[in-house]
C-alpha cells in the first residue's frame, strides 16, 4: 500500500516595505541655505534688472504712456498697428539690416586674413597683436571724434589724400550714398581686433601634424589653408558671425555721434529711432512697442542661426 506524499507549498517572501526617505540632515539643510544665500544677489539682480524691465516694457507697449504723463491708459495693440504702418520705422530697420550686412562681411573676412598672416610666423607677433586689438579698447566717443575729423570735408585726412591723387573731395558724412559706408569703415577699424584674436587663437589650436602631413603630400600654403585651416575654423566662424550680426543689429553709438542719423535719415538705425520716439517724441508706449518688434526680429534671427548650426553639425 503506497502512501502519497504531499509537498507543502513554498512560502513566498513578502515584498519588502519601501524604506522611508531619509530625513535631510542638518548639514544638508545648512548647505542648501548657504547655496540660496550666495545665489540671492544674482537672483535679485536678475529679477530687478532683467525680468521686471521686460515685463514693465511689455505692459508699457500696450499703453499710451508719454513723458508728459498724458494718455497713459491701456490702448491695446494700437502702438503695434501704428508701428507696422510707420514708413520711418521700416526705413530705420532697413538701414540697420543694411549696416549689418555690409559690416559683418569685412569684419569676418579681414579678421580671418589678418589672423592668418600673423599665424604664418611674422616677426614681433606681440606688436601685430597689439596693433590690431588696441582700437577695440577705445571708447566709441573717441573713435567717432577721430573719424569725424578724418572725414572733415576741408581738413580731413581722407580728402587730403584724395586731393594728392587728383580726386575731388568727398562729403563723407553729408552724402546719403556715402555716409553709411563711412560709418562702416570706422566700425571695422574699431572692432575688428576682437574677431582677429578669436581667429588667431583658433588657428594656433589646430594641430601642426595636419600641416606636416599635407606638406609631405606636396600641398602648398594655399591648399593647406583651404583644405585644413578653413574647415577647422568652421565653429569659430559660426560663432563670430552670430556675435557680429547681433552686435551690428544693435548699432547706435557711432552712428549717433558721427551723423546723428543723417543726412536725411540715411544712417538712422532702429535703435536710434526707438530712442527718438521715446525721448524726443515723448512717446514711451510707442517706443516700447517698436522695441518689442525689434526684439522679435532679433529672436527670429538668433533661432534661425541656431537651427542652421544644429542642422550643419547633425
Annotated model-derived regions:
Residues 31-314:
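A structural signal for multi-pass alpha-helical bundles of membrane permease subunits
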Residues 23-27, 31:
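Cytosolic juxtamembrane amphipathic/interface segments immediately preceding
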Residues 1-23:
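Short, intrinsically disordered terminal tails adjacent to the first/last structured region
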Amino acid at each position: 500500500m503506497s502512501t502519497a506524499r504531499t509537498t507543502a507549498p513554498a512560502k513566498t517572501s513578502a515584498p519588502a516595505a519601501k524604506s522611508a526617505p531619509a530625513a535631510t540632515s542638518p548639514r544638508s539643510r545648512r548647505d542648501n541655505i548657504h547655496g540660496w544665500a550666495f545665489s540671492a544677489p544674482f537672483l535679485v539682480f536678475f529679477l530687478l534688472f532683467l525680468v521686471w524691465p521686460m515685463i514693465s516694457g511689455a505692459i508699457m507697449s500696450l499703453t499710451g504712456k508719454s513723458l508728459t504723463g498724458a494718455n497713459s491708459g491701456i490702448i491695446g495693440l494700437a502702438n503695434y498697428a501704428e508701428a507696422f504702418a510707420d514708413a520711418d520705422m521700416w526705413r530705420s530697420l532697413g538701414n540697420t539690416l543694411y549696416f549689418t550686412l555690409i559690416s559683418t562681411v569685412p569684419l569676418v573676412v579681414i579678421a580671418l586674413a589678418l589672423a592668418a598672416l600673423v599665424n604664418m610666423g611674422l616677426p614681433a607677433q606681440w606688436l601685430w597683436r597689439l596693433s590690431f586689438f588696441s582700437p577695440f579698447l577705445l571708447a566709441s566717443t573717441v573713435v567717432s571724434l577721430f573719424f569725424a575729423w578724418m572725414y572733415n570735408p576741408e581738413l580731413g585726412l581722407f580728402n587730403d589724400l584724395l586731393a594728392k591723387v587728383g580726386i575731388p573731395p568727398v562729403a563723407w558724412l553729408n552724402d546719403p550714398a556715402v555716409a553709411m559706408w563711412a560709418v562702416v569703415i570706422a566700425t571695422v577699424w574699431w572692432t575688428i581686433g576682437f574677431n582677429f584674436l578669436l581667429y588667431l587663437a583658433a588657428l594656433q589650436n589646430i594641430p601642426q601634424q595636419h600641416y606636416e602631413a599635407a606638406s609631405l603630400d606636396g600641398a602648398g600654403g594655399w591648399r593647406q589653408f583651404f583644405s585644413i585651416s578653413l574647415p577647422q575654423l568652421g565653429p569659430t566662424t559660426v560663432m563670430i558671425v552670430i556675435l557680429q550680426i547681433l552686435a551690428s543689429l544693435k548699432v547706435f553709438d557711432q552712428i549717433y555721434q558721427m551723423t546723428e542719423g543723417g543726412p536725411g535719415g540715411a544712417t538712422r538705425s532702429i535703435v536710434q529711432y526707438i530712442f527718438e520716439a521715446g525721448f524726443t517724441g515723448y512717446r514711451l508706449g510707442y517706443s516700447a512697442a517698436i522695441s518689442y518688434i525689434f526684439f522679435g526680429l532679433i529672436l527670429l534671427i538668433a533661432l534661425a542661426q541656431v537651427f542652421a548650426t544644429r542642422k550643419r553639425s547633425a
